[in-house]
Swiss-Prot record:
<dbReference type="InterPro" id="IPR036375">
    <property type="entry name" value="Hemopexin-like_dom_sf"/>
</dbReference>
<dbReference type="GO" id="GO:0001666">
    <property type="term" value="P:response to hypoxia"/>
</dbReference>
<feature type="binding site">
    <location>
        <position position="332"/>
    </location>
    <ligand>
        <name>Ca(2+) 5</name>
    </ligand>
</feature>
<dbReference type="InterPro" id="IPR036365">
    <property type="entry name" value="PGBD-like_sf"/>
</dbReference>
<dbReference type="GO" id="GO:0003417">
    <property type="term" value="P:growth plate cartilage development"/>
</dbReference>
<dbReference type="GO" id="GO:0044849">
    <property type="term" value="P:estrous cycle"/>
</dbReference>
<keyword id="KW-0677">Repeat</keyword>
<feature type="glycosylation site" description="N-linked (GlcNAc...) asparagine">
    <location>
        <position position="112"/>
    </location>
</feature>
<keyword id="KW-0325">Glycoprotein</keyword>
<feature type="binding site">
    <location>
        <position position="227"/>
    </location>
    <ligand>
        <name>Zn(2+) 2</name>
    </ligand>
</feature>
<feature type="binding site">
    <location>
        <position position="217"/>
    </location>
    <ligand>
        <name>Zn(2+) 2</name>
    </ligand>
</feature>
<feature type="modified residue" description="Phosphotyrosine; by PKDCC">
    <location>
        <position position="361"/>
    </location>
</feature>
<feature type="binding site">
    <location>
        <position position="197"/>
    </location>
    <ligand>
        <name>Ca(2+) 3</name>
    </ligand>
</feature>
<keyword id="KW-0106">Calcium</keyword>
<feature type="repeat" description="Hemopexin 3">
    <location>
        <begin position="374"/>
        <end position="422"/>
    </location>
</feature>
<feature type="binding site">
    <location>
        <position position="195"/>
    </location>
    <ligand>
        <name>Zn(2+) 1</name>
    </ligand>
</feature>
<feature type="region of interest" description="Interaction with TIMP2">
    <location>
        <begin position="171"/>
        <end position="241"/>
    </location>
</feature>
Length: 466
């Protein structure tokens, strides 16, 4: 591992390919950045590899592995979606390849482990730092037989420190953003140690980088876990702020850590969140909307992003794009002429322009004219040609007039009367090419606006190419 840093500019024989449509958009800086990223996180060249004369993985192979890891279209070309992922702040541990200077073991042989906070970041108080690490260790001790004890001097199993740039382990940090932290797997010397880049702004909130979230991830590495391909997992390599509410370790991480250490005596949170499977025959959806030519499909803490030119839908945590939004979405719709997407949860709604929440939001749904009895919406769809927006709640539908900014008279109406045959509730809805697509559990109805009737009934998951 010592010498993979020496190879940045010398061990590459193949140029990095890029998408044909992106020729004019990619700068030399983009290409250099992408090569550095791939060398760092996909089969980094190590001293052991050099001594053994191991075959150097080509740039294209690394790029394909990276695209596969993140669920992107595996094109072997450097396109915009690939660069977008590369630019996100992340853990410094490779996704594919060895990250260690000394021999590693798969797990700790003992269940009673010690940790020591060697130094502190100036960004938050000492007590906040200590609380963040205490909570982070508890994430793992809650689901395993592991016990963690803090010591204040001497050498602990897990030594925790903050540093900048080159900080003594041959894996230098890179300044603000980019690489946030790294940790070593169980083993002697550096084994188990976790290092945090003090050029980042560490916080106890959604601002900067939340120390608890990053610490919990890094300690997963300290205990023997590699990165997960599951975008909902704590061990997914990209940083995402998960919200103020009580953190629950996702099921993927529970399965991983218990495969090493077994379960604990009593799990305080037996229901761990799972990542939705797009081809689940029982799949139901929370909300659907278009956004600048793409389709956004919300389910639990996630959304799938469907691009017309891409085969595979991409799955993301909602908070990875909009940290200030709630984890779950009730309804959503796009207003193309205003370049806005509206998101609803409970009695609140947000207006978004791309990644940005508009000033003055969230607002209350009562501002739109809903009575206080309406506590949440189940679906919404906007019609650009008429300026009308339909809102669904319970077994009723409302019609909102954009021009007058009021609800239309004679509403609400019963869903079954307004759209015969689709049932008395709607989970999600969107409009395309003169058809309205209503989703109710695992079934979707294609409804013709012109003939006022259902023309097709399909599985919900067919929207995701299943």
């Amino acid at each position: 591992a010592t010498f993979f840093l020496l190879s940045w500019t010398h061990c590459w024989s193949l140029p990095l390919p890029y998408g044909d449509d992106d020729d004019d958009d990619l700068s030399e800086e983009d290409l250099e950045f992408a090569e550095h990223y791939l060398k760092s996180y996909y089969h980094p060249v190590t001293l052991a590899g050099i001594l053994k004369k191991s075959t150097v993985t080509s740039t294209v192979d690394r790029l394909r592995e990276m695209q596969s890891f993140f669920g992107l279209d595996v094109t072997g070309k450097l396109d915009d979606p690939t660069l977008d992922i590369m630019r996100k702040p992340r853990c410094g541990v490779p996704d594919v390849g060895v990250y260690n200077v000394f021999p590693r073991t798969l797990k700790w042989s003992q269940t009673n482990l010690t940790y020591r906070i060697v130094n502190y970041t100036p960004d938050i108080s000492h007590s906040e730092v200590e609380k963040a690490f205490r909570k982070a260790f508890k994430v793992w001790s809650d689901v395993t037989p592991l016990n963690f004890t803090r010591i204040h001097d001497g050498t602990a199993d897990i030594m925790i420190s903050f540093g900048t740039k080159e900080h003594g382990d041959f894996y230098p940090f890179d300044g603000p953003s980019g690489l946030l932290a790294h940790a070593f797997p169980p083993g002697p010397n550096l084994g188990g140690d976790a290092h945090f880049d003090d050029d980042e702004t560490w916080t106890s909130s959604s601002k900067g980088y939340n120390l608890f979230i990053v610490a919990a991830h890094e300690l997963g590495h300290s205990l023997g876990l590699d990165h997960s391909k599951d975008p909902g997992a704590l061990m997914f390599p990209i940083y995402t702020y998960t919200g103020k509410s009580h953190f629950m370790l996702p099921d993927d991480d529970v399965q991983g850590i218990q495969s090493l250490y077994g379960p604990g005596d009593e799990d305080p949170n037996p229901k761990h969140p799972k990542t939705p499977e797009k081809c689940d025959p029982a799949l139901s959806l929370d909300a659907i909307t278009s956004l600048r030519g793409e389709t956004m499909i919300f389910k639990d803490r996630f959304f799938w992003r469907l691009h017309p030119q891409q085969v595979e839908p991409e799955l993301f945590l909602t908070k990875s794009f909009w940290p200030e939004l709630p984890n779950h979405v009730d309804a959503a719709y796009e207003h193309p002429s205003r370049d806005l997407m509206f998101i609803f949860r409970g009695r609140k709604f947000w207006a978004l322009n791309g990644y940005d929440i508009m000033e003055g939001y969230p607002r209350k749904i009562s501002d739109l004219g809903f009575p206080k009895e309406v506590k949440r919406l189940s679906a919404a769809v906007h019609f650009e040609d008429t300026g009308k927006t339909l809102f669904f709640s319970g077994n009723h539908v409302w019609s909102y007039d954009d021009a007058n900014q009021t609800m239309d008279k004679d509403y609400p109406r019963l869903i079954e009367e307004e759209f015969p045959g689709i049932g008395d509730k709607v989970d999600a809805v969107y409009e395309k090419n003169g058809y309205i697509y209503f989703f109710n559990g695992p079934i979707q109805f294609e409804y013709s606006i012109w003939s006022n009737r259902i023309v097709r009934v399909m599985p919900t998951n067919s929207l995701l190419w299943c």
